[in-house]
């Protein structure tokens, strides 16, 4: 598989994971304010509001061939999508968050959350693990 094909598949998996996360948040009562907010120094996957708090959501998605492989990976504690949110990524996110807050003149409380999505595209199956406030106070 060529590098461009791999990147295209990775982008498709990521977009599918973000769509799943948006639907999950809506079902939980969040209002989606923005998606794929992009600056040259970074991107925020989802910006959502729940009551008086803005949630900046980083979505991490991993794809499996079958539900059996997904369940085996989960039960054995192998690679988890949320582990891919490094300190460097959080620093970049903070800079983009500052831009979003300035542009939208928001003085609401805010936090960074992670939505870890595992998908089996062929079987149209997905799971989501939502980790609120990954930085903490």
Residue spans for each PLM region:
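Short acidic/glycine-enriched loop/turn segments that link adjacent beta-strands
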Residues: 39-42
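Mg2+/Mn2+-dependent nuclease catalytic core
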Residues: 64-99, 103
